[in-house]
Amino acid sequence: MTKTGYINAAFRSSQNNEAYLFINDKYVLLDYAPGTSNDKVLYGPTPVRDGFKSLNQTVFGSYGVDCSFDTDNDEAFIFYEKFCALIDYAPHSNKDKIILGPKKIADMFPFFEGTVFENGIDAAYRSTRGKEVYLFKGDQYARIDYETNSMVNKEIKSIRNGFPCFRNTIFESGTDAAFASHKTNEVYFFKGDYYARVTVTPGATDDQIMDGVRKTLDYWPSLRGIIPLEN
């Protein structure tokens, strides 16, 4: 994590144009109004343990979420350091539940044992290709298929080579959080007080940053007064 108090995890909701953003041990539910500055906070900031009752007695309820990605229906994987869980986040209700875990990343995803991903993951986003997800740790990334529970191409690559659009930007060395937009093949990346909206092409390297790397609060007005968050 680059700076405490900023967005350190996020995932796209099953509800259109909504996303969960995690900051320290809290989160907000946001209508992020893709491509505009009409975003608004729908809920929060509130402690993870209060908004997700099923996480109350877990590491996530105590310390928060530092990486996450959506899967199918109302389900998402969440991470904190070397632990992870699959949850049903039950949008706009209090019926959330843990489906699997919490367990160590290496137990949930055995192919990460002995890799930089074993003890924590910085950020992730759901791809539009099948059940694939991109995960980031430091200046490296991997592509996994959560349905077959395997690493695509069995290789970990550098962000610099896989995402040439990030060369000579703050994202070349890593990212704090990411989530896939409801707009096809658009992804938001966050690092400290900056963000980038990127058009991605699954499996290719011709991604492009839209409008450059920008200050988050300049274009996400609903987060003013929320980040940086002081616990």
Curated annotation (Swiss-Prot):
Signal sequence extent: none
Compartments reported by the entry: Cytoplasm, Cytosol
Assembly, per entry: Monomer and homodimer.
Lineage of the species this protein comes from: Eukaryota, Viridiplantae, Streptophyta, Embryophyta, Tracheophyta
Known function: May play a role in response to oxidative stress and polyamine biosynthesis.
Hemopexin repeats: 4-55, 62-112, 118-166, 172-223
Species whose genome carries this gene: Pisum sativum (Garden pea)
Keywords from the UniProt entry: Calcium, Cytoplasm, Metal-binding, Repeat, Seed storage protein, Storage protein
Major localization listed first in the record, in broad terms: cytoplasm
Pfam families: Hemopexin (PF00045)
Positions that bind Ca(2+): 8, 66, 122, 176
Protein name in the entry: Albumin-2
Alphabetized GO MF terms: calcium ion binding; nutrient reservoir activity
Gene Ontology CC terms, in alphabetical order: cytosol
Transit peptide as UniProt keyword: no
